[in-house]
Amino acid sequence: MKLIVGLGNPGREYERHRHNIGFMVVEALLSRARAQLNQEKFAAKVGQGTLAGERVLFVEPQTFMNLSGRSVAEAARFFKVPVADVLVIHDELDLPLGRLQLKAGGGSGGHNGLKSIVSSLGDESFIRLRFGIGKPEGPNARERVSDYVLSNFDDGERREMDALIDRAMDMTELWIREGLSVAMNRFNRKA
């Protein structure tokens, strides 16, 4: 069994925010798997399905981003999913919009959701699908990060979203079918 986690903030007001791209990808994967988030446990919405021939547990933590580790750790422990079979899909400021990257382990890069997961799992070696959202530019860019991640994609960016989410789903399915190295070699080089 694989555990696929989409990071985001709960609530309709956050639904289309850049910070919620993890939820958006999980929703698309659920459609591909003909599954749904039909349970509430581990302080998360949870559903099971089959993707690329493998049983998958889908999780969308319903805590806010900085507490999402609790949901991930509880689900992984309950279903006895090894950390190497946990994929966390999250927004990534350090990648430009349109760039997707798979990687195993690493630090949190300042991402509070990842910090929480690392702390709760006690292990940073889980797989990440980093979905580039770009970052604010210009004067006071650092101070504007919070407003930026909690903003909606603009019209031009929204037009790109379907293709990017499709690519994220393809990356996820290849990771399930053929492993991380194959998926990284195929997709991480593409812009």
Swiss-Prot record:
EC number(s) on record?
A: 3.1.1.29
Hey, which family's this protein in? Belongs to the PTH family.
Q: Which reaction does it catalyse?
A: an N-acyl-L-alpha-aminoacyl-tRNA + H2O = an N-acyl-L-amino acid + a tRNA + H(+)
Record InterPro entries: Pept_tRNA_hydro (IPR001328), Pept_tRNA_hydro_CS (IPR018171), Pept_tRNA_hydro_sf (IPR036416)
Give site residues, Discriminates between blocked and unblocked aminoacyl-tRNA. 9
Task: Drop me one GO molecular function for this one.
Answer: tRNA binding
Residues annotated as site: Stabilizes the basic form of H active site to accept a proton = 91
Tell me where on the tree of life, at the top rank, the source sits.
Bacteria
Entries under NCBIfam families matching the protein: pth (TIGR00447)
- Report the protein name in the record: Peptidyl-tRNA hydrolase
Parts forming coiled coils: none
**What organism is recorded for this protein?**
Myxococcus xanthus (strain DK1622)
Q: What is the lineage of its organism?
A: Bacteria, Pseudomonadati, Myxococcota, Myxococcia, Myxococcales
Residues annotated as binding tRNA: 14, 64, 66, 112
Q: What is its main location?
A: cytoplasm
Protein localization: Cytoplasm
Record text on subunit structure and interactions: Monomer.
Q: Which key words are in the record?
A: Cytoplasm, Hydrolase, RNA-binding, tRNA-binding
Q: Gene Ontology cellular component?
A: cytoplasm
Task performed by this protein: Hydrolyzes ribosome-free peptidyl-tRNAs (with 1 or more amino acids incorporated), which drop off the ribosome during protein synthesis, or as a result of ribosome stalling. Catalyzes the release of premature peptidyl moieties from peptidyl-tRNA molecules trapped in stalled 50S ribosomal subunits, and thus maintains levels of free tRNAs and 50S ribosomes.
Give me the gene this protein comes from.
Answer: pth
Report the active site residues.
Answer: 19
Enzyme class comes to hydrolase
Gene Ontology biological process terms in this record: protein quality control for misfolded or incompletely synthesized proteins; rescue of stalled ribosome
Classification via HAMAP family: Pept_tRNA_hydro_bact (MF_00083)
Which Gene3D superfamilies is this protein grouped with?
Peptidyl-tRNA hydrolase
